[in-house]
């Protein structure tokens, strides 16, 4: 099971607006991060170690370190892998792979040549997500100034999310009853 966050927020925002639905996802990154840490805290346990393998999908070094330390403390390192997008921050990939004792999966889109646009849109989403100023990788390479330290800001966000992981909303933000839906697809299915 890959634990991942943030992949399609733009698409979720569009669907929410177009259909006048509540946003299905969390509305801010702090809550997303806190929920991610809650999931790791919940699943990285001995009682699940024989049943599931966890992919800790992140380029955030704080997150990778937290997952590793939690797995080490609980004796479940064998149930987890680091997962990162191939080609994105190779030096950080190598450092995390070393800490995870080589247990790392690098993923990349693979598509038929006729579907190349799908791979491009995937990579654009990843670049958009990874380059967002509130995310870890831009902070890693951003210059430190006298009044602003991007890595210290990331540490502050990380600590808040860990401290609040059990306090953020847990459950759906939107429900959907497909029996109540209207539209072209529903009409086509009913006619069949």
Question: What are these model-predicted stretches?
Answer:
Residues 188:
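Tryptophan-rich aromatic "cage" segments
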Residues 1-185:
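Positively charged, amphipathic and often flexible ligand-engagement surfaces
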């Amino acid at each position: 099971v890959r634990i991942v966050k943030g992949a399609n927020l733009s698409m979720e925002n569009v669907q929410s607006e177009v259909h006048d639905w509540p946003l299905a996802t969390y509305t801010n990154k702090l809550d997303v991060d806190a929920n991610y840490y809650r999931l790791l805290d919940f699943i990285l346990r001995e009682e699940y170690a024989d049943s599931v393998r966890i992919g800790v999908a992140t380029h955030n070094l704080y997150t990778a370190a937290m997952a590793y330390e939690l797995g080490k403390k609980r004796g479940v390192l064998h149930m987890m892998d680091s997962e990162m997008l191939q080609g994105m921050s190779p030096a950080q990939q190598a450092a995390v792979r070393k800490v995870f004792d080589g247990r790392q999966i690098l993923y990349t889109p693979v598509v038929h040549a006729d579907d190349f646009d799908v791979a491009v849109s995937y990579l654009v989403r990843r670049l958009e997500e990874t380059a967002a100023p509130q995310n870890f990788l831009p902070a890693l390479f951003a210059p430190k100034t006298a009044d602003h330290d991007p890595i210290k800001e990331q540490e502050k966000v990380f600590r808040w999310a860990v401290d609040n992981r059990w306090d953020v909303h847990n459950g759906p933000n939107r429900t959907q009853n497909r029996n109540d839906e209207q539209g072209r697809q529903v009409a086509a299915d009913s006619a069949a």
